[in-house]
Each structure stands twice: as structure tokens, then as C-alpha cells.
């Protein structure tokens, strides 16, 4: 079965950080390395915070009993 999740458009993380004057410092300290997710021999999961800076659509889902709500990109 397919469940449709209504999406909400919000400001992107990049735009919100820019408005608060935080973006420039963040970009200096968090370099984006697209090759990082392809490392071999590293069993840890590579988090790519840069990939989510442009995300502007969110949906709310509920999991469990009693339901717990989560926002997902």
C-alpha cells in the first residue's frame, strides 16, 4: 500500500543560516567532500550535512503505538 505524506515548504537550511549570519562560518568549517561517501574499509556512516542545506520540503510521519511524530526531509 502507498501512504501519501503531505509536504510543507519551508525556508531551506541554507537560507535560514544566511539570514542569521551563520552560513559563511559554517561553510568555512564544514567542507563538502562528495567522495567521502565512497570510502572503502570504513564501517561508519558518512554524514553529509551539506547535502541537506538546500532541502526545503518536509513531511511529518508518525511511528509506533502510541504514535511518535517525526519531521523528515
UniProtKB/Swiss-Prot annotation:
UniProt keywords (A-Z) are:
Aspartyl protease, Digestion, Hydrolase, Protease, Secreted, Zymogen
**Gene3D superfamilies in the record, alphabetically?**
6.10.140.60
> What EC number(s) does its UniProt record assign?
3.4.23.3
Give the location in the cell: Secreted
Q: Where is the Peptidase A1 domain?
A: 57-73
Q: Which residues form the propeptide?
A: 1-43
One Pfam family name is: A1_Propeptide
Q: Which BP terms from GO are recorded?
A: digestion; proteolysis
Q: What InterPro entries does its record include?
A: Aspartic_peptidase_N, PEPTIDASE_A1, Peptidase_aspartic_dom_sf
Q: What is a single molecular function from GO for this protein? A: aspartic-type endopeptidase activity
| Gene Ontology annotations for the cellular component aspect, listed alphabetically | extracellular region
Could you tell me what reaction this enzyme catalyses? More restricted specificity than pepsin A, but shows preferential cleavage at Tyr-|-Xaa bonds. High activity on hemoglobin
Give the chief site where it resides: secreted
Q: Which domain of life is it from?
A: Eukaryota
Question: SUPFAM superfamilies annotated for this entry?
Answer: Acid proteases (SSF50630)
Q: Which family does it belong to?
A: Belongs to the peptidase A1 family.
Q: What does this protein do?
A: Hydrolyzes a variety of proteins.
Q: What is this protein called?
A: Gastricsin
Q: Which organism is it from?
A: Sus scrofa
Starting at the broadest rank, the lineage of the source organism is: Eukaryota, Metazoa, Chordata, Craniata, Vertebrata
What gene, per UniProt, encodes this protein? PGC
Amino acid at each position: 500500500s502507498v501512504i501519501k505524506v503531505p509536504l510543507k515548504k519551508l525556508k531551506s537550511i541554507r537560507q535560514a543560516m544566511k539570514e542569521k549570519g551563520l552560513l559563511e562560518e559554517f561553510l568555512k568549517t564544514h567542507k563538502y567532500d562528495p567522495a567521502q561517501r565512497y570510502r572503502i574499509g570504513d564501517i561508519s556512516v558518512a554524514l553529509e550535512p551539506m547535502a541537506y542545506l538546500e532541502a526545503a520540503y518536509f513531511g511529518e510521519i508518525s511511528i509506533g503505538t502510541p504514535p511518535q511524530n517525526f519531521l523528515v526531509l
